[in-house]
Amino acid sequence: MEAAVNMPEGIRVLIADDHRLFGQALEAILATDDRLEVVGHAGDGSEAVQLAISVDPDVILMDIAMPIIDGFQATKQIRRHQPQACILMLTGSNSRIDVDRAREAGAAGYVTKDRIAAELIDAILEVAP
Protein backbone atom coordinates (compact mmCIF):
# COMPACT_ATOMS: atom_id res chain seq x y z
CA MET A 1 0.00 0.00 0.00
CA GLU A 2 1.39 3.41 -0.99
CA ALA A 3 1.32 6.37 1.31
CA ALA A 4 -1.08 9.07 0.26
CA VAL A 5 0.60 11.98 -1.42
CA ASN A 6 -0.06 15.19 0.48
CA MET A 7 -1.66 17.56 -1.96
CA PRO A 8 -1.46 21.21 -0.93
CA GLU A 9 -4.78 22.73 -0.02
CA GLY A 10 -6.28 25.12 -2.51
CA ILE A 11 -5.88 28.85 -2.28
CA ARG A 12 -9.04 30.19 -0.67
CA VAL A 13 -10.28 33.35 -2.41
CA LEU A 14 -12.88 35.90 -1.27
CA ILE A 15 -14.42 38.07 -4.01
CA ALA A 16 -15.54 41.59 -3.00
CA ASP A 17 -17.31 43.40 -5.84
CA ASP A 18 -20.67 45.16 -5.91
CA HIS A 19 -21.42 44.12 -9.51
CA ARG A 20 -22.96 40.65 -9.32
CA LEU A 21 -22.23 39.74 -12.94
CA PHE A 22 -18.60 40.81 -12.66
CA GLY A 23 -18.27 38.71 -9.50
CA GLN A 24 -19.67 35.73 -11.39
CA ALA A 25 -17.18 36.35 -14.20
CA LEU A 26 -14.34 36.42 -11.67
CA GLU A 27 -15.52 33.12 -10.22
CA ALA A 28 -15.63 31.59 -13.72
CA ILE A 29 -12.04 32.70 -14.36
CA LEU A 30 -10.89 31.26 -11.04
CA ALA A 31 -12.72 27.98 -11.71
CA THR A 32 -10.30 27.32 -14.58
CA ASP A 33 -7.52 26.67 -12.04
CA ASP A 34 -7.90 23.73 -9.63
CA ARG A 35 -5.61 25.42 -7.09
CA LEU A 36 -8.16 28.17 -6.43
CA GLU A 37 -11.36 27.92 -4.38
CA VAL A 38 -13.87 30.76 -4.01
CA VAL A 39 -15.01 30.83 -0.37
CA GLY A 40 -17.32 33.83 -0.46
CA HIS A 41 -18.73 36.88 -2.24
CA ALA A 42 -19.18 40.32 -0.71
CA GLY A 43 -21.35 42.95 -2.37
CA ASP A 44 -20.01 45.97 -0.47
CA GLY A 45 -17.00 46.98 1.58
CA SER A 46 -18.62 46.38 4.96
CA GLU A 47 -19.63 42.86 3.99
CA ALA A 48 -16.09 42.27 2.68
CA VAL A 49 -14.65 43.11 6.10
CA GLN A 50 -17.11 40.81 7.89
CA LEU A 51 -16.52 37.90 5.50
CA ALA A 52 -12.75 38.34 5.55
CA ILE A 53 -12.78 38.03 9.33
CA SER A 54 -15.19 35.08 9.42
CA VAL A 55 -13.87 32.92 6.55
CA ASP A 56 -10.16 33.92 6.75
CA PRO A 57 -9.39 33.59 3.01
CA ASP A 58 -5.85 33.30 1.66
CA VAL A 59 -6.46 36.05 -0.91
CA ILE A 60 -9.11 38.75 -1.16
CA LEU A 61 -10.04 40.26 -4.53
CA MET A 62 -11.20 43.77 -3.59
CA ASP A 63 -13.00 46.16 -5.92
CA ILE A 64 -12.17 49.78 -5.16
CA ALA A 65 -15.52 51.45 -5.91
CA MET A 66 -18.13 49.80 -3.67
CA PRO A 67 -21.04 51.05 -1.55
CA ILE A 68 -21.06 51.56 2.22
CA ILE A 69 -17.25 51.67 2.46
CA ASP A 70 -14.91 51.63 -0.51
CA GLY A 71 -12.22 49.05 -1.17
CA PHE A 72 -9.47 51.25 0.29
CA GLN A 73 -11.26 51.59 3.64
CA ALA A 74 -12.28 47.92 3.66
CA THR A 75 -8.65 46.94 3.04
CA LYS A 76 -7.45 49.10 5.94
CA GLN A 77 -10.06 47.57 8.28
CA ILE A 78 -9.24 44.02 7.22
CA ARG A 79 -5.50 44.64 7.69
CA ARG A 80 -6.19 45.89 11.25
CA HIS A 81 -7.85 42.57 12.11
CA GLN A 82 -5.68 40.37 9.91
CA PRO A 83 -2.28 41.95 9.23
CA GLN A 84 -1.26 38.92 7.15
CA ALA A 85 -4.20 39.30 4.72
CA CYS A 86 -3.26 39.21 1.03
CA ILE A 87 -5.50 41.68 -0.77
CA LEU A 88 -5.49 42.33 -4.51
CA MET A 89 -7.26 45.52 -5.55
CA LEU A 90 -9.40 45.35 -8.69
CA THR A 91 -10.42 48.45 -10.60
CA GLY A 92 -11.13 49.92 -13.99
CA SER A 93 -8.72 52.77 -13.22
CA ASN A 94 -5.07 52.95 -14.21
CA SER A 95 -4.63 56.09 -12.10
CA ARG A 96 -1.27 56.34 -10.33
CA ILE A 97 -3.14 57.89 -7.40
CA ASP A 98 -5.32 54.76 -7.06
CA VAL A 99 -2.26 52.50 -7.23
CA ASP A 100 -0.59 54.54 -4.48
CA ARG A 101 -3.76 54.56 -2.35
CA ALA A 102 -4.07 50.77 -2.75
CA ARG A 103 -0.52 50.27 -1.49
CA GLU A 104 -1.02 52.74 1.37
CA ALA A 105 -4.18 50.85 2.40
CA GLY A 106 -2.16 47.63 2.59
CA ALA A 107 -2.95 45.91 -0.70
CA ALA A 108 -0.45 43.29 -1.84
CA GLY A 109 -1.14 44.04 -5.50
CA TYR A 110 -3.32 45.74 -8.06
CA VAL A 111 -5.01 44.39 -11.21
CA THR A 112 -6.96 46.55 -13.65
CA LYS A 113 -10.26 45.07 -14.80
CA ASP A 114 -9.24 45.25 -18.46
CA ARG A 115 -6.35 42.84 -17.67
CA ILE A 116 -8.24 40.48 -15.36
CA ALA A 117 -8.54 37.52 -17.71
CA ALA A 118 -4.86 37.66 -18.62
CA GLU A 119 -3.31 38.44 -15.23
CA LEU A 120 -5.65 37.50 -12.37
CA ILE A 121 -4.62 33.91 -11.68
CA ASP A 122 -0.90 34.76 -11.87
CA ALA A 123 -1.44 37.70 -9.50
CA ILE A 124 -3.26 35.48 -6.98
CA LEU A 125 -0.56 32.81 -7.11
CA GLU A 126 2.11 35.47 -6.62
CA VAL A 127 0.64 36.94 -3.42
CA ALA A 128 -0.91 33.83 -1.84
CA PRO A 129 0.85 32.56 1.28
Question: Could you say what each language-model-derived stretch is?
Answer:
Residues 55-61:
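Active-site beta3 strand of CheY-like receiver
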Residues 97, 115-128:
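C-terminal output helix
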